[in-house]
Amino acid sequence: MSAPSATPIFAPGENCSPAWGAAPAAYDAADTHLRILGKPVMERWETPYMHALAAAASSKGGRVLEVGFGMAIAASKVQEAPIDEHWIIECNDGVFQRLRDWAPRQTHKVIPLKGLWEDVAPTLPDGHFDGILYDTYPLSEETWHTHQFNFIKNHAFRLLKPGGVLTYCNLTSWGELMKSKYSDITIMFEETQVPALLEAGFRRENIRTEVMALVPPADCRYYAFPQMITPLVTKG
């Protein structure tokens, strides 16, 4: 029997998008794993990394946009920062219900926004956010490695205030890249991510990264590399 990591996350041509919104959000009993349509969406071992992303997105205070709620790991950390408002886009029905239950208990105002970011983001005004954290799950084999670029190019730059910060991840993609193509995570980011950030309008001198050591559990299907990279991308 093959190891869990040997099973591809997406089959050729697979597209989960039509079924994703209404698919059950399967949180395990210990609340350590979230799966949707059998996909490993989030696992609690990611917590230190999610906290680093949250710290980046909330570093300017003000109004923060989070795309993807998941297990509320990053969202709960954002709430610890001195922010004013916390806008969160989430498309899955079950995850959104968890967001609705979570929101009233938070220190800072939460604005839950239901739907795919592709539908919600175009309705948001330019220059509205001091920080953005984009961490959604790829919904098709076609967009496995590229979905974040669609958001970054079409929305992230315009939604940020001048001086605002974008951070994001695509662990499902980056885990595969670090397994199959790269041994240096900073070079991976430089070669596969920076060109899209430049195309979106960010300047090279405003693109920084921080690397942390974090060893995933052996049974994690989507990430095995013992480091994680946090982008810190400022709108000049």
From Swiss-Prot:
Outcome of swapping residue 44 to L: No effect on enzymatic activity
Protein EC: 2.1.1.2
Sequence positions that bind guanidinoacetate: 42, 46, 135, 171-172
Record note on what altering residue 54 to P does: In CCDS2; loss of activity
Catalytic reaction list: guanidinoacetate + S-adenosyl-L-methionine = creatine + S-adenosyl-L-homocysteine + H(+)
One GO MF term: methyltransferase activity
Pathway(s) per entry: Amine and polyamine biosynthesis; creatine biosynthesis; creatine from L-arginine and glycine: step 2/2
Substitution effect: residue 157 to L: No effect on enzymatic activity
Broad enzyme group: transferase
Listed result of changing residue 8 to T: In CCDS2; uncertain significance; no effect on activity
Effect recorded for residue 76 to L: No effect on enzymatic activity
GO biological process terms, semicolon-separated: animal organ morphogenesis; creatine biosynthetic process; creatine metabolic process; methylation; muscle contraction; regulation of multicellular organism growth; spermatogenesis
Residues annotated for S-adenosyl-L-methionine binding in this entry: 20, 50, 69-74, 90-92, 117-118, 135
Recorded consequence of changing residue 164 to D: In CCDS2; uncertain significance
Annotated positions of the N-acetylserine modification: 2
Reported impact of residue 110 to F: In CCDS2; retains no significant activity
Gene Ontology cellular-component terms listed: cytoplasm; cytosol; nucleus
Domain RMT2: 13-236
Protein family according to the UniProt entry: Belongs to the class I-like SAM-binding methyltransferase superfamily. RMT2 methyltransferase family.
Involvement in disorder: Cerebral creatine deficiency syndrome 2: An autosomal recessive disorder characterized by developmental delay and regression, intellectual disability, severe disturbance of expressive and cognitive speech, intractable seizures, movement disturbances, severe depletion of creatine and phosphocreatine in the brain, and accumulation of guanidinoacetic acid in brain and body fluids.
Function according to Swiss-Prot or TrEMBL: Converts guanidinoacetate to creatine, using S-adenosylmethionine as the methyl donor. Important in nervous system development.
Subunit note: Monomer.
Protein name: Guanidinoacetate N-methyltransferase
Species annotation: Homo sapiens (Human)
